[in-house]
């Protein structure tokens, strides 16, 4: 799944090698979580998966908040900003979970790597951010990659469209994170994202909830623990290295997706997926490069 932390946080940059190692490990852990979600997905509504995943993640983060200073650190001046970000996260997660249950992991991961492209485009539209011709060229190249990965010569199914929608939702959470980060603490942002997301997803439960067997609950818990561990490793990576250094290693998620598809489901990536991945990765890496240059003193 696309990640919205590594695209905005800035670390101290004193140990890039360790940061890269932690980021690659984090992506591997989160990719493993996606395998559990793919296994669970066909039997449950994606909103139920989203609800349980967010609930478990909230329970995991609460002890850390209590240790860091208690409920006092959760004071916020921007509740609607947190609510909007949580809504984007819920819709994005539900879209990805729907797609994971119906598409090869690699297909979903390739399209999801367009998050930086969507985020840049949304920044232009809603934040009036200035984007030069170089980044516009990268955006066009990346969106061409998305079109190729969708394989328009065949039938574009609902799961593929759900992946694009989910990617757009995740991009919106990035912009909201950038805005909230100017006034809110990291603990506040993470807690309200998870807790409000749980509440939003819970609103759908009267219509989509089905009984969950004990064995499946174990898979949900495993997915929640892996998700929390992946986020911790990613946060650690961003503490010891600059975001511009570690963010490009998000693209290793494509490799993980291909490997899991081959080993578990014996699925080889299609040529449109491979070619689309090249376009999207090249465009995203170039945008990271340009943003690093623009931020340089």
Residue ranges and their predicted role:
Residues 1-28, 58-84, 195, 199-222, ...:
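Membrane-interface interhelical linkers
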Residues 2-6, 255-297:
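C-terminal-most transmembrane helix of multi-pass membrane proteins
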Residues 27-32, 62, 86-94, 116-121, ...:
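Hydrophobic/small/kink-forming positions within alpha-helical transmembrane segments
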Residues 35-38, 46-47, 61, 153-211, ...:
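Transmembrane alpha-helical segments that form core, pore/gating elements
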Residues 68-107, 112, 148, 225-240:
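Specific transmembrane alpha-helical segments of multi-pass solute transporters/efflux pumps
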Residues 98, 115-137, 255-274:
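C-terminal transmembrane-helix exit sites in multi-pass transporters
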Residues 108-114, 180, 184-193, 231-262:
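Helix-helix packing/entry segments at the starts of transmembrane helices
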């Amino acid at each position: 799944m696309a990640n919205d932390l590594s695209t905005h946080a800035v670390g101290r940059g004193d140990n890039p090698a360790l940061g890269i190692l932690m980021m690659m490990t984090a992506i591997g852990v989160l990719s493993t979580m996606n395998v559990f979600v793919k296994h669970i997905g066909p039997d449950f509504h994606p909103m139920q998966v989203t609800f349980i995943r967010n609930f478990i993640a909230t329970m995991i983060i609460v002890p850390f908040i209590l240790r860091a200073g208690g409920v006092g650190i959760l004071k916020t001046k921007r509740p609607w900003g947190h609510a909007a970000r949580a809504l984007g996260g819920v819709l994005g997660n539900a879209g990805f979970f729907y797609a994971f249950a119906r598409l090869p992991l690699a297909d979903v991961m390739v399209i999801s790597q367009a998050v930086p492209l969507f985020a840049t485009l949304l920044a232009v539209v809603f934040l009036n951010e200035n984007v030069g011709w170089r980044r516009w060229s990268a955006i066009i190249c990346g969106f061409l990659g998305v079109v190729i990965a969708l394989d328009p010569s065949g039938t574009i199914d609902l799961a593929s469209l759900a992946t694009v929608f989910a990617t757009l939702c995740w991009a919106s959470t990035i912009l909201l994170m950038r805005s909230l980060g100017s006034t809110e603490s990291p603990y506040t942002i993470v807690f309200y994202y998870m807790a409000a997301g749980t509440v939003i997803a819970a609103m759908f439960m009267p219509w989509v909830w089905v009984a969950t067997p004990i064995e499946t609950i174990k898979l949900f818990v495993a997915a929640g623990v892996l998700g929390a561990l992946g986020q911790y490793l990613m946060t650690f990576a961003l503490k010891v290295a600059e975001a511009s250094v570690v963010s490009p290693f998000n693209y290793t998620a494509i490799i993980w997706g291909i490997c899991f598809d081959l080993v578990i489901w014996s699925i080889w990536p299609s040529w449109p997926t491979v070619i689309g991945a090249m376009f999207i990765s090249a465009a995203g890496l170039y945008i990271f490069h340009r943003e690093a240059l623009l931020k340089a003193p």
